[in-house]
A protein has these predicted regions:
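N-proximal helix/coil linker or "cap" segments that precede and/or mark the start of modular domains
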Residues: 297-353, 362-372, 399, 418, ...
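Bacterial Sec-dependent N-terminal signal peptides
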Residues: 1-33
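Short active-site neighborhood of thiol/selenol oxidoreductases, capturing the structured segment around
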Residues: 361-394
Length: 490
């Protein structure tokens, strides 16, 4: 097993627990940390802040859910109505020896064993002390740990509490020893196999074992296998870190599939998830594909957003995302849904320098025999550094172009006519008989081209067939050249 495969199990193990439905645990969940060993070696000092933070779909909370100032050898941290999920305990070293500042409003209280109130320290280095999992097993409402420090890492030994967290502490210790080089590959594998066997023997570790199987079994790496062990039907994974990265890895492993196949797979992923997870998975898919490296895959983001993020009459998704993020998704869809690959390019009318209107793209029906087989839309302006770099590269490419006829619509997006005329002169290099150039503009934006063609920035390039079908978008001179070569080879 690769070194980083072991380390990845750290995140896997954080999903310990039963497979019951997610709910807030009744009463308080207490975490008792005996820090004697860590204090004696100076890793933890009086005045340092100990804080519990939780995850929501891979994002660590910024404010502590519970906190305390180190004053004695033991610290008790309390989570009120804790959600079932993954938590981390962070240590923030006091800055400049200060005793700390007042607590943040709304935080749950925590105390040192002498009963003094906790406070958050200002500044200082933050270190991850340990991880634990809150299950909804009512028999385990308190976890006890001994915290030590060696090899520049904190170690947590579980003294009392849920069996899952005992295995988690054991796993973390093995991973940290392996990372520090104190144990080798063979010892690490033996330790992890032992922990996995213990997890299999536990009645309440189905979620953990399904994820452990994914990381431990090197013989099964098929896409179908990866998909089968993603526990998306379990609502508790909303409050974890590992599953989000697993979903992303799964989707990235499929990125060479067609856009249609990816859209189907993405929809299946969302549909298979628990209702509380659906918007989070949909948002993750949207963010992954909205700036897709492979041309055309932004269509996946558009489709998922329309079906699962914007089609919400209750307003709960807008509340979850916040107005700005929700509006950003809406704007992305509106600026891209009309000009995706495979679609017929929207028809617009733009004037040339003489005021003659040109209806573009030319769609072939009723056109004369000289109509171009390819049509290139190039949106650019004068006060754009990227345009100043792209225009000469594009002109040089079209000058040496050899292939089926192509027409370029050089569409100036500014409103200054003299600047437009200066920009037109930059295309004078093109004297290729296979290339026809038409200079157009729309200073009043009467054609609504920014919305119809997704021109939120310049330069933008889009290629269509003689029928006006979009075959390339978001092109650069290099990707345009590659696309033209592929088209001409066929």
């Amino acid at each position: 097993m690769e070194r980083w495969s072991y380390i990845s199990l750290l995140f896997v193990a954080l999903l310990f627990g039963s497979t019951q439905q997610l709910r807030s645990a009744e009463g308080a969940f207490r975490l008792r940390l005996n820090c004697k060993a860590a204090i004696e070696c100076g890793a933890i000092s009086k005045g340092d802040t100990i804080a519990i933070k939780g995850f929501t779909w891979g994002e660590l909370s910024t404010a502590p859910l519970s906190y305390g100032i180190v004053k004695g050898r033991s610290i008790i941290l309390t989570l009120q109505n804790a959600k079932c999920g993954e938590y981390v305990v962070e240590l923030r070293k006091r800055a400049g020896g200060s005793k700390g500042a007042s607590a943040e409003d709304g935080s749950n209280g925590a105390s040192a064993e002498d009963g003094s109130n906790g406070a958050s320290a200002a500044g200082g280095r933050v270190r991850n002390v340990m991880e634990f999992f809150v299950s909804d097993a009512e028999s385990h409402r308190e976890e006890k740990y001994a915290i030590s420090y060696k090899n520049d890492a904190f170690y947590a030994q579980a003294l009392e509490g849920a069996a899952e967290n005992g295995l988690l502490a054991e796993l973390n210790a093995s991973i940290r020893d392996f990372s520090a080089g104190t144990i080798g590959n063979k010892q690490a594998k033996e330790a992890l196999d032992s922990i996995y066997s213990k997890a299999l023997a536990s009645d309440s570790s189905a979620l953990f074992t399904s994820l452990c199987r994914l990381s431990l079994d090197n013989r099964c790496r098929s896409v179908r296998y990866i998909r089968s062990v993603l526990p998306l039907e379990d609502p508790r994974v909303l409050y974890t870190n590992f599953v989000k990265s697993s979903v992303e890895s799964y989707l990235k492993s499929l990125e060479r599939n067609s856009t249609e196949a990816l859209t189907f797979i993405a929809e299946d992923l969302v549909q298979s998830a628990h209702s509380t997870l659906k918007p989070y998975i949909a948002l993750q898919i949207f963010n992954l594909f909205k700036e897709a490296e492979i041309m055309g895959q932004e269509a996946v983001a558009v489709e998922i957003a329309k079906r699962y993020l914007l089609n919400d009459e209750s307003g709960s998704i807008e509340e979850m995302l916040g107005y700005e993020a929700y509006f950003g998704i809406m704007a992305f869809v509106q600026m891209n849904e009309h000009s995706l690959i495979g679609m017929k390019a929207p028809q617009i009318e733009l004037p040339d320098s003489l005021g003659c209107l040109h209806s573009i793209p030319e769609c072939g029906e009723g056109a004369d025999d000289a109509s171009p087989s390819l049509q290139l839309f190039y949106f650019y302006t004068s006060n754009c550094s990227s345009c100043r770099a792209t225009t000469p590269l594009l002109a040089e490419l079209l000058q040496r172009y050899e292939g089926i006829p192509i027409r370029i619509y050089a569409i100036f997006t500014g409103s200054n006519r003299s600047e437009w005329m200066s920009e037109c002169a930059k295309f004078s290099l093109i004297k290729n008989p296979l290339v026809e150039r038409i200079d157009l503009w729309d200073p009043e934006v009467e054609s609504n081209f920014p919305l119809l063609y997704g021109v939120i920035s310049t330069p933008q390039m889009l290629l269509t067939t003689d029928k006006g079908i979009i075959v390339g978008r978001r092109l650069t001179p290099k990707s345009l050249e590659q696309l033209l070569e592929a088209i001409n080879e066929n």
